[in-house]
Amino acid sequence: GKQVYEWIWKKSSHTFDNMTNISKDLRLMLNENFVINHIEVDKIQKSYDGTIKNAVKLFDDYLVESVLIPTEDRTTACVSSQVGCSLDCNFCATSKLKRMRNLNPDEIYDQVVTINNQSLQYFDRPLSNIVFMGMGEPLMNYNNLVKSIEMISSDKGLNISQKRIVVSTSGIPKMIKKLADENLKVNLALSLHSAIEVTRNKICLLYTSDAADE
């Protein structure tokens, strides 16, 4: 079990055939009974400043966006948390898409793995930072968000410090408090849009906290 776990999470293997430190019979049994779902980069768009935008295909053919943002002192992964979005912010293109489903923890994790590989390939350095600022409202996919952060920061996963992870939210008070109670060391970015509540509510329609997927 430990070997399989390491191959899937530490080495990001997408096939049981690669797991050379387990028996051939066990690999055969795993292939016959299980499937390792994984994301695929469907399209890549490169900018003059080095930014790489990926259209990522999920196992059910939905597409989300993941972006590699390079600067002089860091490379940052901007990852998605939902297919579409639970909110309706009138300045955001994603809000025009119906929220189809939440991303699973492994799909969030795989985005980071993919962008880390691109960072190594194109910039010869590993990923240094992660921001949850892609498609979707991260706090409306709360449990899967937390699980992915725990796995990304684990020494059994990518071992990226939680202090280098930013969760961006449009502001769901109940879920912000819940995240604070988790005692994670991640940073929180609040998209305020306006300091005037009436104006803010016109810009971004926040659903009630009861709508949050817990």
List the predicted regions and their residue ranges:
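Conserved small/polar residues in nucleotide/adenosyl-binding loops
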Residues: 207-214
